[in-house]
Amino acid sequence: MPTPLAWGPFSVTPFTFDQVYFLVTLACYLPAVVLLWRSWVMKPFKQWAACLHEFSHALGAWVTCNSVTSIEVHGDEGGLTRWKGNNVECGRHAVLPAGYMGSCFWGCLIVFSCCDPIFMQVVALLLCVALLICLLYAFIGQTEEAPDRLPLIILSLSFTIVIGGVATVCFFLPWHPLLEALMLWLGALNIVYATLDIYDDTVARTDERSDAYQYAKLWGPCCFAKCVGAIWLTASVFVLLTVTGWTWTWLARSEGEVNWHALLPGPIVLSLAVLLRIGLGFVGAGAGEEKPLLPDGGKDKRGFDEAKATDFLRSKVMGNV
């Protein structure tokens, strides 16, 4: 049985060290991501989250026996997934919600993988496989403009090298704390991305180009986009809380060694995020600009919904191909 943490003769907590590490690190990462969400620091990470978002759309097409012709991630944090096939009607019901719910799934899977070092390495390599598939489509996909290929190429290569490199080294060296810190950061990133994106696109406002709006149209006039968004958001939050609870319960069985230095990444990242946010606030105040946490209805600047709605309309026109 795992023993509670203790400091000298005094009992510090009834929890295991792995539970404390998980709670402290995730509790620091989540607000850090939110604080920096609209800053330039998060741009590559948001593009990575967008990459998994588009890959999830592709998974929805493949699951319904359709084919994907291209996957794109743009420099403005937007993306586009083109697909076609003989099961277009069935595909729409899977492809449209796959982006939002896929981001939630990836975030939950990454966080839950931290329960076990081997499982964590497997999930890290699975992420690399997804990135390599996106890289393949960056070269062979039916992209209309050559510059659209470059962001996805750079993104896929960079994150594959970092994630795959650390995961591979962990098979030979005891670098598991580093990989766990990295995976929890990526998991927190996808959790925030999934939650804020669903809320902003579907609940906070109604955009005819959003996935929720197009999905609501599949069910007729009695279904509203905000209702679809509320259902997706509720399901996303429920799954996130459930998986977090599973992870906490699983870590209660662990007997990992106490290493207080492993707790440093979370507080350090949060401290840097606060300082950077304050610094960016001063710069923005000096320039007379204030950037909101969520975009002010400007999803066309990021291209997410426009791309997906174009995808939907394209498949509607194509019919059976």
Name these PLM-found stretches:
Residues 46, 50-51, 99, 174, ...:
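Intrinsic structural disorder
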Residues 43-46, 84, 217, 226, ...:
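Context-gated lysine
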Residues 2-29, 35, 78-251, 260-284, ...:
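Metalloprotease/metallohydrolase-associated module, dominated by Zn2+-dependent proteases
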Residues 36-92:
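Small-residue-rich helix-interface/hinge motifs
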Residues 275, 282-321:
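Non-transmembrane, juxtamembrane loop and terminal tail segments
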